[in-house]
Amino acid sequence: MMKSKMKLMPLLASLSLISGCTVLPGSNMSTMGKDVIKQQDADFDLDRMVNVYPLTPRLVEQLRPRPNVAQPNMSLDQEIASYQYRVGPGDVLNVTVWDHPELTTPAGQYRSSSDTGNWAQPDGTMFYPYIGKVSVVGKTLSEIRSDITGRLAKYIADPQVDVNIAAFRSQKAYISGQVNKSGQQAITNVPLTVLDAINAAGGLTDMADWRNVVLTHNGKEQRISLQALMQNGDLSQNRLLYPGDILYVPRNDDLKVFVMGEVKKQSTLKMDFSSMTLTEALGNAEGIDLTTSNASGIFVIRPLKGEGGRGGKIANIYQLDMSDATSLVMATEFRLQPYDVVYVTTAPVARWNRLINQLLPTISGVRYMTDTASDIHSW
């Protein structure tokens, strides 16, 4: 009896080996016994939800982004030409009355003009000798000068009055995000534009998304391309900043593409300031795997995002046939967009080899079991 059991041991070992082969290749998650929430569109046909475009020179040319060109900004020029600073609460004013030093604000040897000037009070006024309170908030310097001159004329013959601002403290714009020195910037008598503010903030960091800068003005957001403004001289992207404006430079985390499939290094790649081409993406992934890839099946999957719903389409797919390496010319001209997926398909022979590699352990196990059974019978 013991001898028979010993003869069965190799057979049991073989069965264990075969059983192991059916379990090992990857984990599994079964939906049996779980609550599966059925969706109304569960029976969708994915093939009908995408458009496939084989890449041709003409199509690549059509998809090429329109280059930004230098152009003027006439409306901005008019805003700057007509710009006048209006005094706000907290500003410090200096009033000079020529030939009347007793009325002129003394700066003193160790005191700055901002320390000895006239403050614009929260009630919108400042005090001045002889004439008392002067309304200043919301007025330009010329309006304040005219008011003081007219009221001083009752006490001084032909007063010569000059008014300037010693400290701008009431109005600010805010620069935040991916700049080297974020913070508030004073609105002064010198017009402050978006380009001025970025330069005053020390420029952009390496993480900045300079194509999608957000300017919030009066509660409304505007998208500004600093790339077009700074690189191409498109002044239409420049804006005049007003009190309370917020200029935000976002991170470039969303500027990424995914390279998957039969490449040597599957990667998530960040796009730099100058964008990225299909050739660059494949190069950063160390190229396609020449032993397993199907060179005629290089796809760029581009989600339609907010454009979805046009005929129920969710993505456009662009196919590059790289069987002839000359087609890399088209790949070099094909510019990727954020969240594009570059997918390199597997060659049929590679799929067959992988299937064989999966089956070989099982085939070997069955053969071993058969040989073992024959050995048992021969005993």
From Swiss-Prot:
Protein topology in the membrane: Multi-pass membrane protein
Domain of life: Bacteria
Location in or out of the cell: Cell outer membrane
InterPro entries, A to Z: Poly_export (IPR049712), Poly_export_N (IPR003715), SLBB_dom (IPR054765), Wza_C (IPR040716)
Lipidated positions per record (N-palmitoyl cysteine): 21
Classification via Pfam families: Poly_export, SLBB_2, Wza_C
PROSITE patterns: PROKAR_LIPOPROTEIN
Disulfide bonds: none
Region forming the signal peptide: 1-20
Pathway(s) annotated for this protein in UniProt: Glycan metabolism; exopolysaccharide biosynthesis
Keywords: Cell outer membrane, Exopolysaccharide synthesis, Ion transport, Lipoprotein, Membrane, Palmitate, Polysaccharide transport, Porin, Signal, Sugar transport, Transmembrane, Transmembrane beta strand, Transport
S-diacylglycerol cysteine lipid modification positions: 21
GO process annotations (BP): monoatomic ion transport; polysaccharide biosynthetic process
A GO molecular-function annotation: polysaccharide transmembrane transporter activity
GO cellular component: cell outer membrane; pore complex
Gene3D superfamilies assigned to the protein according to its UniProt record, in alphabetical order: 1.20.5.70, Outer membrane lipoprotein wza domain like, wza like domain
Biological role stated in the UniProt entry: Probably involved in the export of the extracellular polysaccharide colanic acid from the cell to medium.
Similarity section: Belongs to the BexD/CtrA/VexA family.
Record's protein name: Putative polysaccharide export protein wza
Classification lineage: Bacteria, Pseudomonadati, Pseudomonadota, Gammaproteobacteria, Enterobacterales
